[in-house]
Amino acid sequence: VTWCRGAAYYTESGWRGSLKTEGGGVLINQSVHTQDLLCFLLGDPTTVDATMTNHHLKDVIEVEDTLEAYIDFNGVHASFYATTSYCADVAPLIEIACENMTIRVEDPHVTVYPKDAAPYQLSVETLPPIGKSYWGTGHTACISDFYQSLRDNRRFSLNLETMEPSIRLMLGTYESARSGHSVTLIEQ
């Protein structure tokens, strides 16, 4: 997740950039949904080793503007990077390297790069994004699914139980970055 947030973004709000009112920086505000997607795609995270820093707004905010983490999903490893010190707002990128292919997700595009064949794009049905284009289409899909669950009289697919791995990962990422040590999220 590489986005651009200048001083005005923080100073013109009454809560951004403060640990007390925001709870954190780039992870909890800009990139938590990318961690959500990693949990959705890779399963329950088991350990995380993270670092965080404030590179470009040291005199403006007290939270991190850059965070990186090495996450283990029960033997599947992920490298996670997020910053608000980039020069532009770019759609989040998730790349999954498998034995025989690499899958690249850049909302709303999914491209498959087979090991021994030409790359191709998967057809993904999406709704128009809400807000800025680099926010992606996930919010629109989530809101649409919520309303559809009400119409269908079914349980909404996202709840505390389904989001627990993602919340555990976010909190563990912060704990690891603050302590300087790897954090075990669930015993294997």
Task: Report each predicted region and the residues it spans.
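Active-site rim elements
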Residues: 23-25, 130-134, 152-156
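NAD(P)-dinucleotide binding in Rossmann-like oxidoreductases
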Residues: 57-64, 73-141, 159, 187
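C-terminal helix-to-coil terminal segments
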Residues: 15, 139, 143-148
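C-terminal helix-rich "cap/oligomerization" subdomain common to oxidoreductases
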Residues: 147-188
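A generic structural signal for residues located within well-ordered alpha-helices
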Residues: 30-33, 138, 158-161, 165
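A general structural signal for well-ordered alpha-helical segments in protein cores
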Residues: 34-35, 140-144, 170-171
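Predominantly a Rossmann-like dinucleotide-binding segment in NAD(P)-dependent oxidoreductases
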Residues: 1-60, 180
